Amino acid sequence: MAEPQQQLVDIDPDFEPLSRPRSCTWPLHRPEFSEQPGNSNTSSPAPSVKPEQGIVDFINSLSLLEETEDYPDEKPVLLNDFHCQDNCAHPQQQHPQQPNPQLTHPQQVPPLPAPASGSSPAAAQRKSSSSRRNAWGNMSYADLITKAIESSPEKRLTLSQIYEWMVKSVPYFKDKGDSNSSAGWKNSIRHNLSLHSRFVRVQNEGTGKSSWWMLNPEGGKSGKSPRRRATSMDNNSKFTKSRGRAAKKKMSLQGGLDGGSNSPGSQYPKWLGSPNSHSNDDFEPWGNFRTRASSDASTLSGRRSPFLPEEDEAAEVHIGYPGTKLGGPLPSLSEVAGHHGSENMMDNLLENLNLISPKNNTQGSQEAQTALSSPLMQGSPGYPSYTSPNMGPQPQVQQDYRKCLYGQGGVGGLNPISIPTLSDSKPGGYGPFVGQYNCAPGLLKELLTADADPRGELMQSGEGQPVLPSYASQGQMAQGGKMITHPHLHAHPRSLHQLPSPAMGLNGCAMLPHGHPVRLSSMKPQPHLPHHTHLGRGGGEAGMPSYTNGNGFHRHGAIAHHHHSHPERLPSDLDDMLIDQLDVECDVERVLHDTLMDGDALDFNFDPMSSQQSFTHSVKTSTHNWVSG
């Protein structure tokens, strides 16, 4: 240590390090110097430096500040101003209160001790002075309130009277009685009255008066009671008890649900994402909510969905019975394919899409009648015939719905696909009312290869000669009427004897009736001259004129059948199965709706071909309206 001290001295002998108490710390540091051998157990800030005597006296005076600031008899040289104010206040305070002098000043502090013996008296004085110190003295707010209540003759005071006593009796509060400066200490008095158990609040007998504050006759605690904290979920005993009861209830419910797992609620704890699966009881309030995040398909219960089951959409009105609805939902394509498998269904579709070429031209008209009288293409047999209600009994009433799949020109025939729900849901079946749009075998190939509008393609018979379809409503099956001529019809000179297909349009308009052939005979042998066509019909409704042009389209003149007022469309899943799966660019609804229903805006023009055996018709729509005569 000699070398560092020598170096410091050699550097600058005039600036020696001085030991001083650290600022901004509490309690104040009391240094012990190295020349005192009796107090060597305490460390010194700079033991190698010998301070001056004046500095030592100043430091010792500061170290005794906390023990000597409240006592009037102590008059250190450096603290005269501070103790002068204190001396002026204490005599005035002691007079009204009349306290015991020995209690206020238990012992007299001797004058400033010598530096050698200053530490031991200071430590003893610090241990003895353990009471709380305030600006008005050694008494707390509770002590002052107690003295104020004891000084009253009735041993009780109101809050305003306690304020008055504080201003009059305690010198520190004499100049703090106004409203601006009294807010702080009055608030402290109210807090002490409420927090301490030694004070009791008694209701005042008079009306509109504040309550009395009295001392607790049982004595109460001398100190402060524990502070009342705001209740929370952590320290609230009521919440703890309720949480314990909820945990017990949860355990009992889980035990009961394990025995009977058939109930829908038993699935909740077994789901890992359920709030009930957590072991922490803090999640217990979430158990009352329904689990929206879980999937209904992954659970055994079908009643866990948070959404109410929506009502099924209104079924399509049956074309045979206006206003009636389907008894059950239509099966989807996935359900239909589930019975036979998707591969089998696609095989059936491909088999029925065979592009059958027209038959040999040398075949007779009888074969053409046979081909036309067959329900659909040869790849899909088993379709029953349809008979008009005006012509006799129906051959088959209990008809499966799959047998009534329509054959639209561009879709072709379909193999009967099992749709069990449709035949089981309605006793009468749908066969007599949902007909089939018959087409000859060569039409599908023609539609797939031609560039013309698919609505303009007409059917060809197996003989290669055109089959001109006749459209008539169900009420026109057996009626007679006059015919009108079409000046632009060019037909082959030979007569076409056709046995029409027993089918019915999807919009309620039946096609050619069974057993009533339409004879298209040319009035003149020239192939390109206008001629009259006659529709051979049996007896039927009289006075119901029907108008037809040369191509065989029939319309009511005055009265439209009730089926016309109920346009129908196929079920959505059948549309998907027949159109989307086959990938044929043909809008079924548009063809049926525009072509068969909007008859007033149709005009058909036929362009002749040079071929004498077979020719193709192109149907062109125009805005020309029919004028009924």
Curated annotation (Swiss-Prot):
Gene3D superfamilies: Winged helix-like DNA-binding domain superfamily/Winged helix DNA-binding domain (1.10.10.10). Residues 1-54, 88-134, 211-308, 359-397 are annotated as: Disordered. It is found in: Cytoplasm; Nucleus. Its main location: cytoplasm. One of its GO terms (biological process) is lymph vessel development. Keywords: Cytoplasm, DNA-binding, Nucleus, Transcription, Transcription regulation. Residues 36-46, 291-302, 359-377, 385-397 have a biased composition (Polar residues). Residues 90-107, 115-133 have a biased composition (Low complexity). GO terms for cellular component: cytoplasm; nucleus. The keyword Transcription applies. Transcription factor that regulates metabolic homeostasis in response to oxidative stress. Binds to the consensus sequence 5'-TT[G/A]TTTTG-3' and the related Daf-16 family binding element (DBE) with consensus sequence 5'-TT[G/A]TTTAC-3'. Main regulator of redox balance and osteoblast numbers and controls bone mass. Orchestrates the endocrine function of the skeleton in regulating glucose metabolism. May act as a positive regulator of apoptosis in cardiac smooth muscle cells as a result of its transcriptional activation of pro-apoptotic genes. This is Forkhead box protein O1-B. Residues 136-230 bind DNA. Residues 240-251 have a biased composition (Basic residues). PROSITE patterns: FORK_HEAD_2 (PS00658), FORK_HEAD_3 (PS50039). PANTHER family: FORKHEAD BOX PROTEIN O, FORKHEAD BOX PROTEIN O1. GO terms for molecular function: DNA-binding transcription factor activity, RNA polymerase II-specific; RNA polymerase II cis-regulatory region sequence-specific DNA binding. Pfam families: Forkhead (PF00250), FOXO-TAD (PF16676), FOXO_KIX_bdg (PF16675). It comes from Danio rerio (Zebrafish).
